[in-house]
Amino acid sequence: MARKTPLERYRNIGISAHIDAGKTTTTERILFYTGVNHKIGEVHDGAATMDWMEQEQERGITITSAATTCFWKGMDMSFPEHRINIIDTPGHVDFTIEVERSMRVLDGACMVYCAVGGVQPQSETVWRQANKYRVPRLAFVNKMDRTGANFFKVVDQMKLRLKANPVPIVIPIGAEEHFTGVVDLRKMKAIIWDEASQGMKFRFEDIPAALQASAKEWREKMVEAAAEASEELMNKYLEEGDLSEDEITSGLRARTVAGEIQPMMCGTAFKNKGVQRMLDAVIELLPSPLDVPPVPGFDEDDKAVTRRADDGEKFSALAFKLMTDPFVGQLTFVRVYSGVLAKGDTVYNPVRGKKERIGRIVQMHANERQEVDEIRAGDIAACVGLKDVTTGETLCDPTAIVTLERMVFPEPVIRQAVEPKSKADQEKMGIALSRLAAEDPSFRVSTDEESGQTIIGGMGELHLEIIVDRMRREFGVEANVGKPQVAYRETIRKTVQEAEGKFVRQSGGKGQYGHVVLKIEPNEAGKGIEFIDAIKGGVVPREYIPAVEKGVNEAVTQGVLAGYPVVDVKVTLHFGSYHDVDSNELAFKMAAIFGFKEGCKRASPVILEPMMAVEVETPEDYAGNVMGDLSSRRGMVQGMDDMVGGGKAIKAEVPLSEMFGYSTTLRSMSQGRATYTMEFKHYSEAPRNVSEAIVAARAK
């Protein structure tokens, strides 16, 4: 079966934004204009097509990135038909992992900003992730019809807060209730959308007299940005003082794909203005799978290889999302990087060393699905019936094995005990939690060895609330949830040259004998546990060294101060002894555990606590109280910015343990007018009095 849409006409894009910037409404309008859905689903009444999980419809926030396919021929039908695969990403900080996952498989992104709120905290997080995966992007300033809307202020904020290089390619005509359309700076014409047709029709007009000088000035900046794409364009621009429309487009495209500039547009998705122009820009300025570098990976021998976006290459794809569907079971969303995958094919998962047979392949339109017989390079689709694949794993042709780079997922910073309400819930809860953990790698499930309780861990209070909510809705599990617990860590501050561990049991017959001497030293922050074998002369036989490493890895799960996991320690095995008859792996493992614990006690152990980057947006009247309150929570206030629509944005770093219940305090302090976001920043040493309290609480 031949490819319906040539690969150069594919666009795999993400739509990313802060909560309430109007991202879901923007996606809805895209689906409407591309003719996929004929009734515009409004977020306000919980009917948006992309927000397909029940809680999202209630909370009005987007939680899981749904993947949708649509087609576009241009606002004035001037392009050949292009295929746009859209990944809708969440804007709430607790779901940052979803954004990270979708960034990994995108070729381009469209950042949606609110014309009133401007660049908000989550916008910065998403921007950093897009930088990490080198995703070319456009910016769309939404909600131009709202009171306080200011397009040019958002342009300045992007430069200041994101260190971006925004290049407006349209400017607004009017603002707030007088926003009527945009000036297209390439055509130097005003675009006015027809409200009766919900923006499906539009007309070109002359630029209003009051805007002509401003349009000329912004056009010059845009042409200059385009000219910098190549020497040829620059020379023409210097000689003639201008470029043709096609030259501007090709220059802007080259620089956008290279990540040097971010073309900017504006509109109001809710009032059906501007989204159509943004779709044109997606096609004109964002890359196709052929424009981005081949995806890197490793073959069986761990040699670096790449896979090109080409149907003729061997098949390779990355599983970037798992979802449980009530009707078809497990859906595994994949991005195909090379080759073709047909129903019934067998693929290989190099991470697990297993083969899997592909049952059905479906392409999603939000949560409506269409079955397809095959998918090709550049496609995004969901496979049904894969048993043993988790997020971030590679699927490839069994004859050409490749592991595409793995995604790295953060450790949870907050934990809660969860107990089923009845015996019947007990069995269902295990199944529910393991399914949810497979879908979401930033959510972890473990058992507390002392109390036997089930512990769930995640990236924030809202994250865990939604998990418990999903257990109830999707799996019918009623559960009681304990108080949130902070995920503390332990580490050391001093080096201990000789930490000796001995495990000897000799009382007639075959005994046990293991003896190790370890050097224990602090490691760089974030480096984790490093084990180095420095044994010379066989004083500890080769076959027992893995057992020593295993012992160290077991010992680090419980620190010596309060039993929290130990991080960032370098352990060197440099001496020891053995017994010809009595030595075995168990004895050396135990010796390593004893040696490590003994060494840690002498290495100035400390407790680390998670520090959160907190940003509070508040009316100016309450700024002083907010800062005082953050300081009383052991917070370090790092700065205060003016917000686009008035008010202050206060940035601070605060220990997570001090932030429980903060939303209630903030609400009462500001009469419900302040909001905040919080995300994990790093671990930091807890002050002595806090440390002592933590140790005392654990000892009870």
From Swiss-Prot:
State a single Pfam family of this protein.
GTP_EFTU
State the Gene3D superfamilies in the record.
Answer: 3.30.230.10, 3.30.70.240, Elongation Factor G (Translational Gtpase), domain 3 (3.30.70.870), P-loop containing nucleotide triphosphate hydrolases (3.40.50.300), Translation factors (2.40.30.10)
Q: Which GO terms describe its cellular component?
A: cytoplasm
Principal location class: cytoplasm
Provide the tr-type G domain boundaries. Answer: 8-290
Keyword field contains ATP-binding:
no
- Where located? Cytoplasm
Q: Does the keyword Metal-binding apply?
A: no
Query: SMART domains, per this entry?
Result: EFG_C, EFG_IV
InterPro entries referenced in this protein's UniProt entry, alphabetically: EFG_II, EFG_III, EFG_III/V, EFG_IV, EFG_V, EFG_V-like, EFTu-like_2, G_TR_CS
Q: Care to name a GO molecular-function term for this sequence?
A: guanosine tetraphosphate binding
Q: Which UniProt keywords apply?
A: Cytoplasm, Elongation factor, GTP-binding, Nucleotide-binding, Protein biosynthesis
Tell me where on the tree of life, at the top rank, the source sits.
Bacteria
Q: Which residues form a coiled coil?
A: none
- Cite the binding residues for GTP: 17-24, 88-92, 142-145
Q: Name one GO biological process term.
A: ribosome disassembly
Q: Which HAMAP family match?
A: EF_G_EF_2_B
Family recorded in the similarity comment? Belongs to the TRAFAC class translation factor GTPase superfamily. Classic translation factor GTPase family. EF-G/EF-2 subfamily.
NCBIfam families for this protein: EF-G, PRK12740.1-5, small_GTP
| Function, in words | Catalyzes the GTP-dependent ribosomal translocation step during translation elongation. During this step, the ribosome changes from the pre-translocational (PRE) to the post-translocational (POST) state as the newly formed A-site-bound peptidyl-tRNA and P-site-bound deacylated tRNA move to the P and E sites, respectively. Catalyzes the coordinated movement of the two tRNA molecules, the mRNA and conformational changes in the ribosome.
Q: Supply the name of the protein.
A: Elongation factor G
Q: Which gene encodes it?
A: fusA
